[in-house]
Structure formats: C-alpha cells, structure tokens
Amino acid sequence: MKAIFKREVKSYFTSMIGYVVVAAIFAFISLYYTANNLIYASPDFATSLYSTSLVMLFVLPALSMRSFADERRNKTDQLLLTSPVGIPSIVLGKYLAQIAVFGLPVVLACVMPLILSLFGSVSFVSCYAALFGYFLVGASCIAVGTWISALTENQIISYLATFGALLVCYMINSIQTLFTSGNTMAFIVFCIILAVVSVLIGLLCKNVTIGSAVFCIGAVALVLLFKLRPAWLLTAFNQALDALALFDPFIDFVGGMFTLSGVIYYLSVIALFLFLTGQALERRRWN
C-alpha cells in the first residue's frame, strides 16, 4: 500500500492535476476569505468556507477520474490486479493519495483563522469544526469518484459521471420537494434515476438485456405504486433522499457543532464506496 501511495502522489504532481486541484481549492477559499473576512472584517470564517463547497463538484472529480480509469486505459490494471498486493491495499493506497492532495489546501487554510485572530475575537471551535467538516465532505466526494473511476476506462466519462452524482447530492433538497409535491415532475425525475441505475447495472453485468429488464420491471413497479399507493413510495423515497444529502451534515459543522452523527455519516459513506470499489476490482480480477 505504501508503494502505491507514493507512486500515486508522485503521479499527481508530475502531471498538472495535483497542482490544479490544490491551486483551485486554495484560490477559492482565499477569495471568499479575503472578500468576506478581511475586507468586511467578519470573524465568521465558517460561512466563507461553506460558500466554497460548490467548488468540490468541479475540482474533485478531476482528482478521482484517473485513479482507476487511467490504469484500464493504459492496460496497467492487469499488472496491478495480478500483483501480490491485496485489493484493499490497492484501493486504500490510491484513495489516501487523493486525500493527501486534497488535504494540502485544507491544511494551508488552517492558518486563516489565526490571521483573523490578530484583528479581533474569533471562534476557533467554529472555524476548525468547519474545516474538519469540509475535509470530511471532500473525502466522501473522493470516495464516490474513486468508485465511479473503477467502473470505466474513460477519464472523461468518469469525470462527468462523478460530477453528475455529486450535483444530485448537492441539489438533493430541491429534488426532494418535487417528490413531496407528488406532481408529474416527480415521476419524471424518478424515471431518470431508474434509467441511471439500470445503465449502471448493465455496465457492471456487461449485459444490455439485464439492464433493460431492470428498467422495465422498475418502470412497471413505479407506475403501479404512483397509481395505487403514492404515499408509500414518496415516504420511502424521501427517506432515501435524506441519506443522499451529502452536504447537509456539513451545515452542522459550519454552525460550530461537532456532531458525532455527522462524522459517522461521512465515515460510513467513505467505507461504503471504498468497499464498492474493492468489489468492482475483485470482479475484474476474477474475469
């Protein structure tokens, strides 16, 4: 795992990706920090940090897109999968390398509350709780991107799929209002989600028939539930949407509340998607 970690970190900084990711994240944090905290003399660093969370949707997929997709494109995944290194070590090595790159601008941002304290009173608990939450959100986004990268050999597809998944998580509260209203738009969005799931199943199974069958069965069930028991479907699905609200627990950290439930949620997301990444690699190893 150590060798893979070193190789991945080196590869990020021998190419432009590592520098671009670090520079982009730190630049946006610095921009909001300067505009909100330094110019207007506001001690609320947590809110400035929260304003930059949207940047993750664009930057972090660029970090995770090459983790496994590049290996498949260059056919070096065969060497990796047949090496004596276990699948968990491969996944963790690549994931921790991405975390190291992402963590660099976060560590640099830790100095910002100290600078603010030179000009007045600053709540360090709120500032560093927000930074910790920011790191956990980013680590979760990277885990999602790593799994998607393991499913494809095209970096562009990996980037777009990761961006789409994170965008859905970011806008999940807006999407949820469509379902609570029970209108036609809710049905359309549900069909789109079903189509995406069916495509993923078809890709994993490498069988268009299976993916099509899943979509047809799901569509029939969807129509029946909306016609006969719409309340059941909407209640169950709203609960599922709550679980997909990846950025919601971050709000508690921004408010200065170091919640154990938020930490457990993010660690669970990371563990789940790293496990799914390992399963995708295991499947390719046996195939």
Residue ranges and their predicted role:
Residues Y50-L54, A130-V137, N183-A195, A213, ...:
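Alpha-helical transmembrane segments of polytopic membrane proteins
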Residues S11, A69, L80-T82, C141, ...:
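Helix-capping/transition residues at the boundaries of transmembrane alpha-helices
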Residues P88-L92, I148, L281:
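Alpha-helix N-cap/helix-start motif at helix boundaries, enriched for small hydrophobics
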Residues I29-N36, Y40-A46, Y50-V55, A97-T162, ...:
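Secretory targeting signals
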Residues S67-A97:
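Helix-loop-helix units of permease transmembrane domains in multi-pass membrane transporters
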Residues A35, Q155-I251:
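Transmembrane helix segments
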Residues M1-D70, Y95, V111, C127-F132, Y159-L160, I188, L203-K206, ...:
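Hydrophobic alpha-helical transmembrane segments
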